[in-house]
């Protein structure tokens, strides 16, 4: 992908990131850790439950030297069944867990452990950038779960850090980017199997967590939970409630990015990769009511933002797309695009999630993570058969995303989803949330990183940080 936006090469865009990251001054940083191909990598994990445990399970061949989690008792519950008996399949992970140094605060971990080569960051969204920046400034390679950052400014800040230290190996946790099916989708779209694509639809069944709800009253927190560290950079403290932690934080404005942030990296990834549309030039969102709001449809966000709307439709216009103007529409909360008249009855849009590309010579549809691509239209199969394999395949596909990062750290292969790829993708997703919070369509200049038609909406490209947790 040589030209990420019209008139600008990717190098131009990367080089300009510092100028568009606000007034942030990035201090000097340590050189990236060098690891021999024969060595095991010293890995730390921040957020060792949930996705962090899944990531760690893929990395037990390495040295898991440190873990940081705000509720280590909760993490330990994953190793036993409902009766307290050990789960045999979890024992390799438990062995790694038992050997690792443990912290509740990753800032203390970074200060005290000088042997960390690489870190997995699998915290709630509002911690991602703060933890990643702290690691990168120490020369530590980073694997950051999706969505990469909570704000546009954070993404551009991390990209500038990566640009200044090109030996740092960075990876976003959108594992579908390493999958064989998704890579074939990109080849087919670029190879013209369905002709020129000017319309894309992407959808998900999320949320699977509280969203569109009023903020609950605080309750007593579990004794094992360090609530102050869980809040971290969040500028508000509503008090603990299980609707926030664990897992359920995704739908609450101070902590997560909603359904678009949670699943966009597994769906929007492929059209952005294949079509190289650059920055969206216009974004408009229609949605159900905000949590705590009484309006049913397109109600203005309440002053005290609680949870995101349960469902939304976000339309992106890419006026500078490489192949000509492109429209991409996102649906969540169970909403789906209308079935095209040309869609055969044998082709079914998966209600769990998928992407539909509408070309002038046919259509292509796939599930989440780029899986199970289906070609639709006369002559499409024949044209697809003629499209050569051009992208490298990752060992073990999407199940090998973590080890691709390790092998890249060792210098054995190219990284799959580095920040140079992940930041522009993440920015596209975030602009949908900005339009939602601005409560009106926004027009965006990707080169400057500014909203041009609604000046006050630019505040949503950044955020406030709690004292002691600033980026």
Question: What is each of the regions a protein language model found here?
Answer:
Residues 2-140, 156-169:
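N-terminal glycine-/serine-/threonine-rich beta1-alpha1-beta2 phosphate-ribose binding loop
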Residues 14, 56, 76-79, 107-110, ...:
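Non-transmembrane alpha-helical segments in soluble domains
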Residues 15-36, 307, 407-471:
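C-terminal helix-rich "cap/oligomerization" subdomain common to oxidoreductases
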Residues 45, 121, 144, 151, ...:
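Hydrophobic residues in well-ordered beta-strands that form the structural core
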Residues 54-59, 77-80, 130-134, 153-155, ...:
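Short, solvent-exposed loop/turn and secondary-structure capping segments
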Residues 103, 122-127, 148-150, 155, ...:
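Short, solvent-exposed turn/loop segments enriched in Gly/Ser/Thr/Pro and often Arg
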Residues 141, 149-224, 229:
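A contiguous active-site-proximal alpha/beta segment in oxidoreductase catalytic domains
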Residues 223-403, 407, 413, 427-433, ...:
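Glycine-rich, aromatic-lined ligand/substrate-binding cores of catalytic
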